[in-house]
Regions:
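An aromatic- and glycine-enriched ligand-binding surface/loop that stacks and positions planar moieties
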Residues: 16, 21-75, 166, 170, ...
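Long, intrinsically disordered, low-complexity segments
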Residues: 20-21, 93-94, 162, 168, ...
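Conserved, well-structured interaction surfaces
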Residues: 39-49, 53-57, 73-138, 154-167, ...
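Extended amphipathic alpha-helical segments enriched in small hydrophobics
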Residues: 127-128, 199, 378-424
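Flexible, polar/acidic helix-loop-strand segments at domain edges
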Residues: 314-384, 592-601
Length: 601
């Protein structure tokens, strides 16, 4: 039975408005009085329950795009040229902070010390989480640790330094680690959730500082390594390995699997709490997500060698390129022989539902959930594998990584699917040219242990694909230029049949696996639709998709010649401050570099 988080909507009525000066001085007096509330453990729990709605919905995972997955309409952050300074909103909202600080001001009224310290830990966890999200998005922000009155001069104060805010975040998350209950719960914050959040925060801050030239990166990376190792040693969590397809099943399970999942967002179809993971992937008129070719290429062979070292890898067709690859590839996208959960029918990629042909199946459950808002599998917010990855990356970026460190982190993750571990010395002796190339990899890694850093990034990209991490991974690594590169799909060698303008070819995506070798999967054609029998699906070139070299090549998604993308290195690593907020502070709140908002103070 799931334990549902019940949000106290009535207790926070009136707080759902954006804008610094509105949000921070509001309290729903019609609902409750702070001077008479917060007396019991139950009241502390009830009030803090609402903080959980800060967490992202499932759509932030299965709907992730960036450079890993290409959707029908790219987000403005990827296109770059269309980004503008908003008048209001844009992530500059402070309602949750007001609630958290209000709670912390009055929670002392509860005489149950153990309960109070636990729920104070919950509140400080969420304040750390709130500010971490703000720092990622805006950089320096004003720090508030109290609920403000409407005439408080701090409402118009400038930003505080990044160091002050990060030190305050560390203080909050350390308190949460020390005082939150350590009993594992899928849908509530515990000591272990706080440790996982600290690991995430410290890795972000340490690598952001390192690659953006800000002092102090070593301190945060060391903190990340320390707390991650403590989690590995002390926590009750481990990597889920049961079944034939444990990686797929981890995300398709209706109830989050507690062996690995530290915290999940609870979905329940019977209670009307649903999402659209299946619909997003299977519908022909919705997101049409497809994995980018460069990410497909980054999956290793089953023996641990690089796919991109294979002769002719660039022109391999779908069936051949999918053979003997890291099993996570065909547990993330449709592969040859793919069958839906609870089905024995072999299916091929549906190009009408995928921009690249590499159709996403991560988070996808059985066909009964394919309708709009038909999915209700839990969404994972924190899991053990992320902490293991954080540990390995922090140690690698510090230059203190050992093979033993990889044994207790990356190896455990790869053991799930039978993949060999990273060999640190081999990786450093021969860094992957594909991951070094600016077109397909990371241009800013220059450390002596460059090879193993790249391999850990490969592992992170594959393991955490479609879990909402990729955009800010690119930000912290200072690799925004990735968004300017072409987004490509499957390769097709050409149309060899027919003549003139009416040419076509047929492609068996499953090589007869379906049991009907007389019926191939698709026919691609130009001009008039050919009279070819036993074809499951026809696609007209130029309408259904476009290839890089006319009648052959890779599928092109969002052609950069027609839809140019530009990443501004001096501007785009931070979001702009809304103009209304700057005006309310008479310019004390400065704009982020490179964003011209037309205000002159």
């Amino acid at each position: 039975m799931k334990k549902n988080i019940k949000y106290i909507v009535a207790a926070v009525a009136g707080l759902w408005l954006t804008g610094c000066t509105d949000d921070l001085d509001r309290f729903p007096l019609s609902s409750l009085s702070p001077e008479t509330y917060f007396n019991t453990e139950e009241e502390l729990e009830t009030f803090t329950n609402h903080f959980y709605s800060q967490f992202p919905s499932a759509a932030s995972g299965y709907g992730e795009s960036e450079d890993i997955v290409n959707i029908f309409t790219l987000p403005a952050t990827t296109i770059g040229l269309t980004r503008t300074v908003p008048t209001k909103g844009g992530g500059w909202n402070w309602d949750y902070l007001r609630e958290i600080n209000l709670y912390l001001k009055y929670s002392h009224r509860c005489n149950n010390k153990i309960a109070r310290e636990h729920y104070d830990g919950i509140a400080r966890f969420f304040r750390a989480y709130f500010y971490f999200e703000k720092v990622k998005r805006f950089g320096d922000v004003p720090w508030y640790n109290k609920p403000l009155e409407s005439n408080d001069p701090d409402l118009k104060k400038p930003r505080d330094s990044r160091q002050l805010v990060m030190d305050s975040i560390m203080s909050d998350i350390d308190y949460a680690i020390n005082y939150c209950d350590d009993n594992p719960e899928l849908y509530r914050v515990t000591k272990w959730t706080a440790m996982a959040l600290k690991s995430r925060i410290c890795l972000f801050e340490g690598t952001f500082r390192k690659y953006h030239g800000i002092a102090g990166h070593e301190t945060f990376l060391e903190e990340c390594a320390t707390i991650s190792k403590r989690f590995i040693d002390e926590s009750p969590y481990s990597i889920y390995t049961s079944g034939d397809k444990p990686y797929r099943d981890l995300f398709a399970s209706m109830n989050a699997i507690q062996q690995e999942v530290i915290l999940a967002r609870d979905y329940d179809y019977t209670k009307g709490v649903k999402h659209e993971a299946n619909y997003n992937t299977m519908a022909q008129t919705y997101g049409r997500p497809g994995m980018n070719k460069k990410i497909v290429n980054s999956y290793l062979m089953t023996n641990g060698t690089r796919f991109t070292d294979q002769p002719g890898y660039k022109t391999m067709q779908y069936y051949d390129e999918m053979q003997n690859r890291d099993p996570r590839l065909t547990q993330t996208v449709v592969g040859p022989g793919y069958m839906r959960i609870n089905s024995d029918k072999v299916e091929s990629p549906n190009f009408s539902s995928s921009t690249t042909g590499y159709q996403i199946i991560k988070w996808v459950t059985d066909a009964s959930c394919d309708g709009y808002m038909g999915s209700s599998n839990d969404y994972i917010l924190f899991r053990a594998a992320e902490v293991y990855l954080n540990y390995a990356e922090a140690k690698a970026e510090l230059g203190t990584l050992t093979q033993e460190d990889l044994e207790i982190s990356i190896k455990k993750i790869r053991d799930r699917v039978g993949m060999p571990n990273i060999d640190m010395f081999a990786a450093n002796a021969n860094p992957d040219p594909y991951l070094c190339a600016p077109e397909t990899g990371y241009r800013n890694v220059t450390d002596p242990n460059k090879g193993v850093i790249l391999e850990i990034r490969r592992e992170r990209t594959i393991e955490l694909c479609l879990e909402g991490h990729r955009y800010y991974d690119i930000i912290r690594w200072k690799e925004g230029k990735m968004f300017e590169q072409p987004f490509l799909g499957m390769y097709f060698p050409g149309l060899t049949q027919g003549s003139g303008d009416n040419r076509y070819d047929v492609f068996d995506m499953n090589d007869g696996i379906a049991g009907d070798k007389e019926k191939v999967d698709i026919c691609i054609y130009t001009g008039k639709k050919p009279s070819v029998k036993n074809i499951r699906k026809f696609y007209k070139l130029g309408e259904e998709f476009v290839l890089t070299d006319g009648d052959k090549g890779n599928i092109i998604c969002h052609d950069i010649e027609k839809e140019p993308r530009q990443w501004n290195e001096e501007r785009d690593y931070f979001f702009p401050i809304p103009t209304t907020e700057r005006s309310l502070t008479n310019g004390a709140l400065t704009q982020n570099p490179g964003w011209n908002d037309g205000l002159d103070f």
